[in-house]
């Protein structure tokens, strides 16, 4: 539906359809998928490498997050921005608690750490959404612009994209499960890009920062993409078929 909405917006030049397609693709599709993967897999990964780690993966928590995420989506689609806090305050509480429960208390390797650093963007996202909605409700002023969305899209989605693709690429190419330099560079650079993009929403010369952030995306991901592209076109490092 989101893709169809975007295509329709291009054909009809209706910018409202772009808004709907982004919301459907973000909170309606990507967020439920990403948060479900985090809920099921990240504690499992931690349990395999961190001594004494206790898994915490209640389905009731996941169901509650899905329900409030759909409420958030519905309110956004209805343009009820001043009421988003009804979904986002609970989501902030749920994701903050989960981040605390999931976080390994012992030493963890880099390839695991980047997963949890990425997860930390979720409560920050809903803190920004909650603040934005409550300020709008109280004063009628819409502040922060798209900062909450960029915390979600670049901070959370972008971080976990690099972390998970690196993990799968290393493992399925017969390489050790470590964060290579290109992945570290991409990951750290994305954190900087996220902060700059959020900050650009409250600066006076926003278009300058848009350009800086766009270049930042390319600089961050190009070495990483080149490396994994080379791996995909090469035989497995351990000599096994595949």
Residue positions per predicted region:
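Juxtamembrane membrane-water interface segments of multi-pass membrane proteins
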Residues: 7-19, 36-58, 74-85, 98-116, ...
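Alpha-helical transmembrane segments
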Residues: 16-34, 145-156, 215-218
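Generic alpha-helical transmembrane segments
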Residues: 89-95, 152-163
């Amino acid at each position: 539906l989101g893709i169809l909405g975007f295509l329709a917006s291009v054909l009809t030049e209706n910018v409202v359809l772009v808004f709907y397609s982004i919301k459907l693709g973000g909170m309606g599709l990507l967020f439920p998928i990403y948060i479900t993967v985090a809920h099921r897999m990240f504690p499992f990964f931690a349990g395999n490498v961190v001594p004494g780690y206790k898994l915490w993966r209640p389905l009731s928590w996941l169901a509650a997050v899905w329900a409030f995420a759909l409420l958030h989506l519905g309110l956004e689609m209805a343009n009820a921005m001043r009421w988003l806090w009804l979904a986002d305050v609970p989501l902030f509480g749920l994701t903050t608690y989960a981040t605390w429960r999931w976080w390994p208390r012992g030493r963890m390797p880099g390839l695991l750490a980047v997963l949890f650093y990425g997860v930390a963007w979720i409560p920050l996202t809903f803190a920004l959404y909650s603040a934005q909605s409550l300020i709008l409700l109280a004063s009628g002023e819409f502040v922060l612009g798209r900062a909450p969305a960029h915390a979600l899209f670049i901070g959370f989605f972008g971080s976990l994209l690099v972390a998970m693709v690196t993990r799968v690429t290393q493992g399925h190419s017969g390489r050790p499960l470590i964060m290579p330099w290109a992945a570290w560079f991409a990951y750290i650079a994305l954190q900087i890009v996220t902060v700059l993009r959020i900050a650009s929403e409250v600066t006076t010369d926003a278009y300058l920062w848009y350009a800086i952030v766009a270049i930042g995306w390319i600089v961050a991901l190009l070495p990483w993409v080149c490396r994994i592209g080379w791996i995909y076109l090469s035989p497995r490092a351990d000599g096994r078929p595949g």
